[in-house]
Amino acid sequence: MSWDDAIDGVDRDTPGGRMPRGWTVAARLRAANDDITHAAVADTLPAYAELHCLSDFSFLRGASSAEQLFARAHHCGYSALAITDECSLAGIVRGLEASRATGVRLIVGSEFTLIDCTRFVLLVENAHGYPQLCSVITTGRRAAGKGAYRLGRAEVEAHFRDVVPGVFALWLPGDQPQAEQGAWLQRVFAERAFLAVELHREQDDAARLQALQALAQQLGMSALASGDVHMAQRRDRIVQDTLTAIRHTLPLADCGAHLFRNGERHLRPRRALGNIYPHALLQASVELAQRCTFDLSKVQYTYPRELVPQGHTPASYLRQLTEAGMRERWPEGAPANVVAQIDSELELIAYKGYEAFFLTVQDVVRFARAQHILCQGRGSSANSAVCYALGITAVNPSETRLLMARFLSKERDEPPDIDVDFEHERREEVLQYVYTKYGRERAALAATVICYRGKSAVRDVAKAFGLPPDQIALLANCYGWGNGDTPMEQRIAEAGFDLANPLINKILAVTEHLRDHPRHLSQHVGGFVISDEPLSMLVPVENAAMADRTIIQWDKDDLETMQLLKVDCLALGMLTCIRKTLDLVRGHRGRDYTIATLPGEDAATYKMIQRADTVGVFQIESRAQMAMLPRLKPREFYDLVIEVAIVRPGPIQGDMVHPYLRRRQGYEPVSFPSPGVEEILGRTLGIPLFQEQVMELVIHAGYTDSEADQLRRSMAAWRRGGDMEPHRVRIRELMAGRGYAPEFIDQIFEQIKGFGSYGFPQSHAASFAKLVYASCWLKRHEPAAFACGLLNAQPMGFYSASQIVQDARRGSPERQRVEVLPVDVLHSDWDNILVGGRPWHSDADPGEQPAIRLGLRQVSGLSEKVVERIVAARAQRPFADIGDLCLRAALDEKARLALAEAGALQSMVGNRNAARWAMAGVEARRPLLPGSPAERAVELPAPRAGEEILADYRAVGLSLRQHPMALLRPQMLQRRILGLRELQARRHGSGVHVAGLVTQRQRPATAKGTIFVTLEDEHGMINVIVWSHLAMRRRRALLESRLLAVRGRWERVDGVEHLIAGDLYDLSDLLGEMQLPSRDFH
């Protein structure tokens, strides 16, 4: 039986979905009847517009996407479809796109349930009504916590008092209609209030229809037909029921009245509707739909203009700031080509009307710099000479090849994207500046839509179907990363599940339906939307989970569709590290540097990089990057740009990496079909490694800037099912017309397709390469300050505090060792600090590297406020004894225990056992009367070496004593297990047996199930490659080991060393209770 057969029955004759095999024959017949083609009888069917329909953005209520709903509405011949998600417009832009694709007109609306249980739908009539609806939604959402809303009648009335409503209101009577609710709605909306008659083939439909018509007549309201639609097709009922169970956190079997009685809340064929509703009610829905003339695509958006001083236009002020920036960037005068580029860009920016947007980004960057917050622009904006002149980006246009079309062009529809990184610890200051500058009414973060993935979906679905927790865990593991290319049915069978079991079939079928189904809104990582008018007139605003944060209900794709500009204020840990390192270098070593003034093209720094001595630096610290460095051997800045970009899915999938390396190493000749291509690809040896190069190639062949940008977007969409064939045909024709060989054209197009996977634009890679060089220079020349800054910037990066300290203490042939001193309550501050050493005077007299004193921030369970009290009390006068420390720093029992466990009292009372005893007896030893003799200190033996190391890792996360593997080395020798030093003496291809502490597990998307594991022993790190078949066979050892033993083949090629695993087994028992940090699958 095939996998599709096992999980689902698929009806290919109708748009949209799958029908679980567990359905009855009657259900199948009903679903089939839904989809009878209406072409032959179209003229005899009643017209209809659905005015009450929830999409999947009514989270855990709506079962179908806007795309599915509009496809179904088109199939059924509806004249219009209203998307009316509950107190939300989060899915409305997707509705707009689906409307465009199908030709079914979109009506914008929203459903509400007030605190007194009055239910109604608001439909937008015109441009005046849209901001009214957005404001009502915003009021309800801002009055409640994340994901909820709260609205009363008073709030609704306030929005429509003294204004002409631009919306229609549909009253949704309950099972027991309360006439008073309809009367209230009519008082607020007058003749714009309607009574919605919703019938779902239940026993009392006839009586309900009669009662509602009578009620409408009594109230003087017009009645119309609507469907309370929750799904596109009847077959989706099982999905909708499951969502209901998830929403109520109940098993399906216990949901009872929470579930709908039948599957009628779908988009029904007009024939079926004609058999249920009087023709007049159906016609009334069409007539009201015709009155709703609002077009969402016509929403007008204006960017703030208050940054423009009096006497200036936005264009003139932007030019003034740009020219001032040019003088600062090029004191001797900018090169002529740069001046021309800037003039061209300013003209284009003015043509597109984006001047105020650039001014806003410049203002945010100016604020950050004034507060000494490191920041740097990246992404496609680094193609802009104006951004460089304004200080937004750091890529000098006189030193690199820019392609403005990658960022902005006259024909390009989407708005420009400017990403700016800020120190991750201080980014909140920047966000709050934006809120303060523009007001919370005009600034909010974009949303991110959190969707179900396989593992999260199967957990929720299996729980809804009543599967026991242990079986849920087993089933969820089948969707985990560690399954390689094993077919799903095999994974499930191997986990012990019966694929013939109808319950398992239903769970799996619903899980497949819920993949990529929206689960809830979250906040974007930093994309700010700022408007000249209140944002709630443009899009609803709601509270984020974090305090003092608000988000709009649209995500970045919605913003692009609606042509809204966002400023991306992103957080980058390495900027925090670099700023703290530069402060330490300035304060302790007497060297005053910025990123821009660090000595460039330093041979010693590149030598360190070539040896892959890059633990803790930016971007090139991963195992994959480290494996590339000895092969690529960067010698100059542009090599770092290539290094940043080449270890990405795009170049790997496009088979660009190995040809580039062969050419770089001289194993393959470099040739170009024309001087024009050589100008574009010369620096990358004929291989297109960057998106800009692809765009330049096709522009050179004959594409316009706009067509080249469309190719870029097609590349991004190709992996998601987009069509590249039209581009293949066009590129082949254009390049053949220039005389290029078919082999070259095919090679280039395959490489272009590789960019369908994630790849960096050159501008982005160049921006990141600036930080790569800065962090590497600091690591090479100021290793103590760099390690200290890196520790103080945690959590960030690939490596734990333990690995950072081990690397600093170990040093390398290219880098001095750093002494690290333990945490000490008499000497440590909150942050790690530098002590001793000798300041730098010149390159000839570089001074002496200081030591690092570990800070109290490293102590688990100790808060910064407690440490502030300790440091303040210590500054007043030295602590006389433990009792004095506890009294003057007001240490509670938790803090006392944390200090004792961390060994931070060594200089006061001695070993850990003595510290524990002293802290435990602080209260008991306090004299009852002044002058009473103190109890004599008890001398306790020190813990054994293994116990000390265990306690270090438990309390501080690292140890300055022996490495755990050094303690275990005698046992390793007995087992004939090698250490790194012995391993490095072995020949390439040798069979070896090693073991180490697991510090990282990685599974790149391009690795086809291969797992990369990093082991650590007392001499360094060992890279292990585990093929997918072994990963499956030794899954438990691979995933759960703290101490992993590996038998395999040692390989050493071009300076790259790794171990190909042949077998794995777990030796964690040798570590006892020791828990070690491991960074897994990030």
From Swiss-Prot:
A biological process term (GO) from this entry: DNA replication
The protein's Enzyme Commission number: 2.7.7.7
Catalytic activity field: DNA(n) + a 2'-deoxyribonucleoside 5'-triphosphate = DNA(n+1) + diphosphate
Database matches in Pfam families: DNA_pol3_alpha, DNA_pol3_finger, HHH_6, PHP, tRNA_anti-codon
Key words, A-Z: Cytoplasm, DNA damage, DNA repair, DNA replication, DNA-directed DNA polymerase, Nucleotidyltransferase, Transferase
Gene3D superfamilies documented for this protein: 1.10.150.870, Metal-dependent hydrolases
Cellular localisation: Cytoplasm
InterPro entries: DNA_pol3_alpha_NTPase_dom, DNA_pol3_finger, DnaE2, DnaE2/DnaE/PolC, DNAPol_HHH, NA-bd_OB_tRNA, PHP_dom, Pol/His_phosphatase_N
Entries under HAMAP family matching the protein: DNApol_error_prone (MF_01902)
Function (record text): DNA polymerase involved in damage-induced mutagenesis and translesion synthesis (TLS). It is not the major replicative DNA polymerase.
Similarity comment: Belongs to the DNA polymerase type-C family. DnaE2 subfamily.
Name of this chain's protein: Error-prone DNA polymerase
Organism field: Xanthomonas campestris pv. campestris (strain B100)
